[in-house]
């Protein structure tokens, strides 16, 4: 059995090829690169396309579907619209359309939004949207890798999304625009609200630069800003303050969910959550009274492949989310 998992991230598309539960290859295409190359042709360098049994696809916010759904039955790529979601490059759209127009079987993973009824109704009452589809994939990877039924997952990269899993189901969490900051994205504060009201900036533009990049003079685009900040942690006071502030913010978000999970298992993921120099996970551990573990860097793509494989093996539900395939 050969499956492919896709993570549609801020800085690019990551794909994992898995055969009989074993990861065979992982490759990444920058969003700007996708506009010049065919995703399927790049995938064909890793695996014969005719041998693929199923692809697990993540796309954008995933707020137009509430089940893991056969791509043939998904309208408008599974989203309500593309407004208010950060910087739009177009690479993910191209990849999605390539897959849908091929004859390769595929499923589309939804995001977590208030139409997903498997979550606690209080979180659905509080927030219209909690996470994009790849966060479900990351959670499933963590669930399968560590075997916990109860844990907190914090995915830290361009943005930070923290989710709570209880009894093997996603219970709720905090989206990128309401809680902790990431490198690029973060919640909108008073100054940004005033700038929006004064028509100096749109809400989406404010969100897209409300992360710790605002602390620095280091914006280098969606793909390279994190390297500029992280690699200068010991050399630039603003970069150090940015990372230290991110660690504080994420630690606060994780701790805010801790009372809901007596097992106190915490799993960190994402390019920043797994960053080793500076050692972000160690810095966060110092602020957390719990069992803190780190998931691999390509966790979203691998998780999407795990979802596809388990659906082929007959699973009708993933972390509480129903399957329509």
Curated annotation (Swiss-Prot):
InterPro entries: ATPase_NBD (IPR043129), Methan_mark_12 (IPR016735). NCBIfam families: methan_mark_12. Belongs to the UPF0285 family. This is UPF0285 protein MMP0642. It comes from Methanococcus maripaludis (strain DSM 14266 / JCM 13030 / NBRC 101832 / S2 / LL). The lineage of its organism: Archaea, Methanobacteriati, Methanobacteriota, Methanomada group, Methanococci.
